[in-house]
Amino acid sequence: MLGNFGIAIIKFIAAMITGSAAMQSEGIHSMVDTGNQVLLLFGLKQSRKPASEEFPFGHGKEIYFWSFNVAILIFAVGAGVSIYEGVHSLLHRNDISHGEVNYLVNYTVLAIAMVLEGIAWALALKAFRREKGDSGYFEAVHRGKDPTNFVVLFEDSAAMIGLFVAFIGIFLQQVTGNAVYDSIASIIIGLLLGATSAWLAYETKSLLIGESANRKVVQGIRKIVASVTQVNHVNEVLTVHMGPEYILVNLSVDFKDASKTTDIERTIATLDNRIKAAYPEVKRIFIEAEARLPRRTSHTDNEVVSES
């Protein structure tokens, strides 16, 4: 975080010296990254608050809320300012004296930033690969439940692409003597931030609303329930992520007609223990005892609830 802030300051100083709109946008980009990390750290801290009477399921969704804010506020603001800087520079490019542009300053700052951002990107990619397992990249992002993993990777990827765009824009300006390329680079960086913002908002929105657990987890829970002797049929397995490591489960189960109340109670305890042992991220389980029906038309059946 401090590294990004330091890079942002250096980029802004370079932009003041050289008059480069692309470098100005890169400074904004690094400042955006810094604010991004501050909000994500705050969200992680808030999400670890314990459950209370007011928030019985805890604060796990705080991380989803702040990740969504990162996408909407920071990236969107960064995109808007970068595009504005590029358009402004494009319209007033004759005000810049090309003889005063110190390209060595720009290239030095970009080289340092590329090395530092490259290291951060490699670490983020390594962590993301470890988390995604055998899933593809897009599938892992779409089905991922911890936004901090893919937000950081997206942020660092956008930063690397932005640096290359800035380099190309400044290089073309140096070769041609036309400042329009530097201005266009600034606009492209803004569009890159905007695209990143839209994609992150799309992915975090569904988490904020409430996504189900991954298909393998749901199928695994169904198999555990179906394997218990007293269970005649598993009607429904409903899950929702209350946080990256917090799954709430609601089961609709048809117990065998001959089952006694004590048998059902023991079965519920067994299910609770087995499911939580297999999937530690499952924190709360609610079980409804319902007869098997062709279509579920009512929620007025008797309910037996298991909580922990």
Indicate residue ranges for each PLM-predicted region.
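Alpha-helical transmembrane cores and adjacent cytosolic helix/loop segments
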Residues: M1-S212
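Peripheral (non-transmembrane) domains and long loops of multi-pass membrane proteins
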Residues: L200-S308
